[in-house]
Amino acid sequence: MESLIDLDHPARTIWEISGELDLSRFEAHCKAREGEAGRPCWPAQLLVSIWIYSYTLGVASARAIARMMKHEPGLRWLSADQEINAHTLGDFRVGHQAALEEMFAQFLGLLDEAGVVDLRRLLHDGTKVKAVAGRGSYHGLRTLQDRVRQGRKVIRKLDQEAAAQHEGMDGKHEAAKRRAAREALQRAQAALEKLKKLQAEAAPSQQQNVRVSESEPDARRMKQPDGGWALSYNVQVTTEAQSRMIVGIGVTDAGNDTQELMPAVEKAQANTGVAPEQVIADNGYATRANVEQTSERNLELIAPWKTDESREAGACQRNGIAAAFGPSQFRGQRGGQKLQCPAGKKLILIQQITHHGVRNNVFEARPADCNRCRWRKACCGKRGGPRRVERAVESPAMKQYLERMQRPEVKQLYRKRCEIAEFPHLWAKGVKKWRRFSVRGLVKAGIEALWVAMAYNVSQWLRIKSAIPVAA
């Protein structure tokens, strides 16, 4: 067996790494029971090593792994040429979430002890990974209701046929048909229940447009990098800066990233036991809520704020206001009590209002000034006038953040975000072709993502070790 692979083969290193970790939690279920026939319980180190090694090969199918164990040298060496069936492999992968999370954190601890990670500075990014959803499984309320009714009819018919069977006839085929019918009904019922929940959360005008996949109810229709749309999950990845190791990974059904930053930071801290000092993310995470929450944690957020010009462009177009008269073109005067428009007219502070938890000062021009102005149509737009402009009253945390993002050294630091934060996506989706989950459901998708993260970290560690010169 030793001649199957070289001494520096990745399978050997993965076996050694898994041997350094406490995997007892994986084997908690392997207990003998009096009066019951024993079944083989494969060692956790073996199954963990097989899955990590397989993901580094870009193989995510339990059936494919079971076939490859007959000829792939690394898998043959790990299993000592023993055959492990696909059901055992598949059940192990998704059946030990808590143990897997503990193992992931243990390995990060070993990397920290080796001095190859910088847990003070984190980088965060998200990517969409397609779900295991059938092409024709995306249905609305009426179709799913019909599927449930039809499923119940089929089961009643099969039960009646089973009751009428003569004694001595082989009923295995009929039993399999009944089992398949019940599973189909359960999927339709789960999808219908999910759809009703989503309808309750949607705006009344959008409820009739809600759709759910019958084969993958948790998945959501999300925009893909190529501009298309597909039923997917949103994978949130947190990476440390020094060696690009993943320190946290999570899977959500939210198409928008804005609310995922703080849960990701908390997960990374739980995995490492170290409170980060800085987090770098793209502008999709730059919200006032995230600025305030990171400030409360003494966590420095580096994420480019969308300028007033970019935020207001759509609003100006909808309201018939020329870009030259957008709110950002009005200049403050007298300590923020007045604004001056591009045409030289004064706007006076008239009130303070709150939108989505943010205080805004409202400035308004004199009606006579707007009525006499030759730029009235371009400035006042569809509203007609007098012109009003709102300005956010920024909190101390927001002011500090905006000032920070103007510093040259911070801008230079942000330029490194892409090559670090997006590298795990390139490894998983580009190199290893992991562009679709191989398991169903949000929980199991999260478990598979953690296996991918573990395999990625191990592959990074193998790369780092290979670059270390061997002492003579």
Model-derived features: positions:
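Anion-binding and metal-coordination hotspots
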Residues: 58-71, 82-472
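Composition-driven recognition of low-complexity segments enriched
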Residues: 41-44, 52-64, 74, 79-81
